Amino acid sequence: MAAFLASRILYHFAGIRFDASPVAIYWQYIDPVLMRTRLVESLFYLHMQPPGFNLAVGLVVKFFPSSYAAVLQIIYLILGVLIAFLLLHLMRLFRVPEWIAATLTVLFVVNPGCVLYENLAIYEYPILFLLLLAAIALFRFSRAPTVRHSLEFFALILALVLMRNQFHLLYVLFLAAALLAVFPRARRAVLVGALPVIALIFSLYLKNWILFHAFTASTWAGMATGVTTTFQLTPEEADRLVRGGVVTPLARIPPFSDLKSYVGYVDAAPATGIPVLDQAETSTGHANFNNPTYLKLHDLYLANSESIWLHYPVAYVRSVLIAWFAYFLPTSDMHSFDDVRPRIQSFDRFFSAVIFGQFRQADSRKDLRAIKAAGGALRLPFYTGTFLMVGLPLLILWASAQLALRRVRNRWKKEESVLLGFMLFTILFATAISNFLSSFENNRYRFVLDGYYTVIAGLAITALITARRPGRATRGVL
């Protein structure tokens, strides 16, 4: 707690302030005016995103219209304190020695990226909090598989699904099936917790299917594939593929452009009388991607993506390589922080080099592309987190071995194995979704998983130290 408070005071004096501007300008949000005046209606007709985060922020904006930024700041600061305690508690559940757990927790909470996300009104911080809380809830269920503990765990999983489409219905179904298999005597408890959650998620998907012909919680998938395919084409490649009939001229337009860019490609959707659907732009001036016209564009972008996957997959390979490169970047290395990161430049560079292994830093992603274009591809790994590039796969392999190899699996208590398996599955599932279906901001998507990576690092360090001390207990990590 002392390290958390001291770091926040120092960051404040360095000029780090809470940024609530995303509420007004980020694509993920509905219009703030609609949050205040037509929140329930707007959430019902929201299809571009799951409704959970807009519900939470919308309630703050609705009840504190002139001071919502201050209220959100307090909420995020409280989340920061809770995240620190949850991370420490999670390692204690695994019986990681106090000095290791405390050291890793301090490094996590003083990390510039963690502090910057704590001061940005976007959903990374709440998702990180929910993931840590869900892990602890699962540990409680594994130790005492009651209906109450099952309800607690699946309620938190529901909150994750309603907040970001990265946590898909398939994710929930797999978790439910796994718990049914692992706890055969507690199947009633698992089903009582899981079935209502699955039904609610299915209802959300069904609502979007009925209204928008898309069985999903988020209709961005089609256009998002364009980011990983046609957006990766050079202008010359795009022209050649258009002339060859491989893709349509839409390939020349970056995905998620404003509606004016698509005149002549699709007809505007008819007015509905529902502002969250009818707006071309929000009252704050950014494109309203919830406009049904974009649904037609999603289909067109997806058709182009399918052609790219089949006839010119090199474009998709570029996206995957960029995604993995970005995945290992320090969490502070994001364009969202371009205005504030210079205020902590010295400490950020020190932390990124010593902890993450980022030995060189580019001013922007455009600079990285210029380095590659100039024949400097072999130098690019020094611009990402080299320690992360090596360390995170090793942690995944180590955790997998703990579950797969009988001679080490038997050292763990059942609740420890279940929790480790859950963290590992969540890391692999969310990472695969992020890195194969998106590009550029993958270190942002990784940030919510860094809590799990930190816990696994604590387990691995403890196991390494214990292995070098003959005669110590071998049960679990100790």
Where are these regions (language model features)?
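Juxtamembrane segments of multi-pass membrane glycosylation machinery
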Residues: 37-48, 52-78, 95, 113, ...
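Extracytoplasmic catalytic/substrate-binding loops of multi-pass membrane glycan-assembly enzymes
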Residues: 12-31, 44-59, 66-70, 215-218, ...
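Short hydrophobic alpha-helices at membrane interfaces in multi-pass membrane enzymes
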Residues: 99-100, 137-159, 188-192
